[in-house]
Every structure is written in structure tokens, then in C-alpha cells.
Amino acid sequence: RPPRSTLLPYTTLFRSGLTTTEGLRVRTGLLFRAGYLCDLDGPDRDALDSLGIRTILDLRRPTEVAARPHPEMDGVEIVQASVSSDDNEFAVLANAMLDPDSEPLGPDHIAAYFRGNVTDRLDRYRSVFETATDPGRYPLLFNCTAGKDRTGFVAGILLRMLGVDERTVLDDYMLSNVVRREWIAEREVEHRQRIAESLGIGPDEVPETRLVASRALLNCARSFLRAALDAVHDGWGSWEAFRRDGLGISDDRFAAYRDALLA
């Protein structure tokens, strides 16, 4: 079984049974996504080692890596590729959503963040996709802290470039809510308590608008990733144009990626 961390179970990026619109089967066991890895021990660490990971592609900022460094793994290359600015846009958004002195934000703001990955921050992701589409680095695991926002965006783009239809890609993205169900429930309680303390009220008195913001932060929503996919369509018109002109992935690199992942 996939190993579990205290934050997010590892997931093979490509679930068994995924197919492209051309009817090709997507291979599993080559790309994985996860949250932070430092808490793994015992059987979970053994399971991670059994995956034969060759490359870890870390999307976190240096401060996140320092707080939760990678475990020692023999023969594994760690590629640091922070996709966040020093201001860490998502953390700023998260803090604003939970700040009692600010206007409550909601799911639309996270969807706008995802769209901005394509319209405003794509340059930070180009090296990520260049690495993730290199079969010479497989098996490859890419991770962030929560394993759902930065990695969820990358996973969705990788699948759509392969030709998996949008509905299936969104279904795959939403699995993060399933595998993180217990963790989400625990964090919702913590968020409610934190908001209550900051407002000077009891947990049962927290306004629904604040709880909506909390749930939006902790859960995946189809509208989040769809916003990014729509931005690709709006800006480039096709996945081939986006791959070539937006991400700068050459025809030869993309052909090698397809050959490795499709059967």
C-alpha cells in the first residue's frame, strides 16, 4: 500500500485505470506526489523506500524545507524548485482568510490563486515541468507542504498534457479530500479554536463566513484546478501550444514523456 505521512498519504500520481482521450493507458509507479516527508518512520518509511524513488522534486520555499527537511534517502537526488515568492502568496492568502481583522475571503480567492499560477507565475513552474517530464529521473516524487495546492496544480497540468480528459483530471485532484479526510477534520477543529480565540468568542459562536474560509483552505474544490485549466485554454487555446510556448517543453522531451507514461 502507499505509505502514509501524518499530513498526506503518498499517492501515485497516475491512478490505475486512467486513460487518455486516445484510449492509451497511463502507466503507474513512475510519478508520485505528497506533502512533507520528514515524519515517516517504521513501515511507512519502508514503503517509501520500496518505491525506488530516484528524484524528489521539492516545490517548497527554503524556509519550509528548513522547518521540515527531507529524510535521508540513499541514491535520491533532491531538486529544490520553490514556486513561491518570498512573500509566499498562498500563505498571505491563508492568513488573510483566517485573520479576524480582515474581510472574510472564500473559495473564489483560492481559484484566483490557481489561475494566477498560469497567468502570473508560470515562469516559476517551468523548471518544475522540465524536470517532471524527464523520464531519466523516474521514479520521481514531487512534494510541497500540504500536498494539494502546488502539487495539485502540477499534477493536473501533467495529466492534461498527456491527454487525460478534464473531468477525470478534476476527479483525480479531488481524491486529496478523501485521503486527507481525518487530517482535514482535525485541522477544522484547530482553525475554529484559533478563530474563536482571536475574536474573543466561544468555538460555537464562530461566524459561518469564517468557517467557509477555513474549509476552503483545507479542502480541494473542482473550481480551484478548473480555474488553472481554463486559464490555459484562454491564454493558449490548446495544450500543445501551452506545452510548447507556455512551458517551453520541446517536442523531443514531450515525446519521451509520452513514451514513458503511456502504453
Locate the predicted segments by residue.
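Short, exposed "boundary/linker" segments that immediately precede the start
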Residues: R1-T6
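Cys-dependent protein tyrosine phosphatase-like superfamily
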Residues: L8-L141, V154-A263
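Substrate/cofactor-recognition hotspot
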Residues: G147
